[in-house]
Regions:
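N-terminal, charged low-complexity regulatory/assembly segments
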Residues: 1-229
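Alpha-helix boundary/capping and short turn/kink residues
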Residues: 37, 41, 289, 304, ...
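Short amphipathic alpha-helical segments with coiled-coil-like heptad repeat character
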Residues: 59-63, 245, 353-355
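Extended mid-to-C-terminal alpha-helical interaction segments
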Residues: 213-341, 356, 364-365
Length: 365
């Protein structure tokens, strides 16, 4: 596409609409997705770690198969008033149409790599992926090892038989909702409703979409997130009870659903203590570990340390260092920047002060 036409599309694109919603379907599905990474991310809500540990091997496997291998067949492409309504619609959907939607999403370009207003086109005719060898080779090229061949191979066995795929998806999601998430959803719903009410009450009119996202998430966003936010024409910001300090997303066409850990916006007051407790638990969880405290202690003594310096000084493995630094960075206790090929970190004293202030306000001392 000529550069001039791309410029025109960007200039003529409508302004971004931003709203705060609970989004039960997106919220519940993402909580189920977190069960697949409970052993990789520290700082997730206790429900996630406890539920992940309680799953049988078969259910744990099926959770990955449905929410990773068949992900785009279950991704909501619109808002739903309840998870049950989403499930009913999914159950009534044509299995072949679901499969074709999965293949179309898989083969289209990453939308955040494209100018705003430009629709992605398939990188390969979707129907070619019905051949397993073609599918597995294409995955190896596209994801460069960042996928599970066993899960993807089994997913392929299902989506070449759409009715079988559909039956697995419906059975698994209905079971997970009924046995694990329905009671938990009722418990956290009042807190999520309060979060949405408080965020809606703030004045966001003078900020662009990227500025709103930074303030809501309380994070300096990486280019990956910035690209998606700047391209989206409809952004729905969704508080999650289970996400901890991390971010999550769903996208479809020009719509982006961005999930963040439920908390209060700066300066706002909660009408109940649940929302403040939730935010405190996320912040204090990052401090409730000897290795993470040692990392903060080191950064308090020096202006900046790179990841390899921390690994050497604390004699810890690279995966352990990465996991701890990811949580500290997401919580805001450290700032991250690139120095050549290295990730380097500095202490964010302001965030530590904010945590102390939040604890004082909560305890009323």
């Amino acid at each position: 596409m000529p550069a001039q036409l791309q410029t025109e599309l960007i200039r003529n694109a409508p302004a971004t609409s931003i709203q705060f919603e609970i989004e039960p379907a997106h919220n519940a599905l993402y909580s189920m997705m977190l069960l697949n990474v409970a052993d990789q991310l520290s700082g997730l809500d206790e429900w996630v770690t406890r539920t992940a540990q309680s799953l049988s091997p078969e259910r744990r496997h099926n959770n990955r198969l449905v929410l990773e291998g068949l992900h785009y067949a279950v991704t909501p492409i619109r808002s739903w008033n309840s998870f049950e309504a989403y499930l009913d619609d999914l159950a009534a959907s044509d299995p072949t149409e679901l499969r074709d939607r999965l293949l179309e999403r898989l083969t289209t370009s990453k939308v955040y790599d494209l100018p705003r207003g430009v629709r992605p086109i398939p990188s390969i005719p979707p129907q070619q992926l019905l051949d397993k060898a073609t599918y597995m080779n294409w995955l190896a090229e596209k994801f460069a090892g960042d996928y599970d061949p066993e899960i993807e191979s089994e997913a392929h066995d299902y989506f070449v038989e759409p009715a079988r795929m559909h039956a697995l998806i419906i059975y698994h999601l209905q079971t997970m909702w009924r046995e694990y998430l329905r009671v938990e959803w009722r418990r956290v719903l009042p807190m999520l409703e309060e979060a949405v009410t408080v965020f809606r009450a703030q004045d966001w009119s003078k900020l662009n979409a990227l500025q709103v996202a930074r303030q809501v998430t309380n994070q300096e966003l990486k280019p990956y997130w910035e690209g998606m936010i700047e391209r989206a024409q409809h952004i729905t910001l969704i508080p999650s009870a289970h996400l901890g300090p991390y971010l999550g997303k769903f996208s479809h066409d020009d719509s982006l659903w961005l999930l963040f850990g439920a908390h209060l916006p700066g300066g706002a007051r909660a009408t109940s203590s649940a929302l403040t407790r939730s935010e405190l638990l996320v912040r204090l969880s990052a401090l409730n570990d000897d290795t993470r405290l040692q990392i903060l202690e080191l950064l308090g003594q020096r202006d900046e340390l790179c990841a390899q310096d921390i690994i050497t000084l604390l004699d810890i493995s690279q995966p352990a260092a990465s996991r701890h630094l990811k949580q500290l960075s997401a919580t805001g206790y450290v700032t991250e920047r690139r120095r050549d090929a290295n990730k380097c970190y500095a202490l964010n004293r302001e965030r530590l002060d904010e945590t102390c202030d939040l604890l004082h306000r909560f305890l009323k001392i």
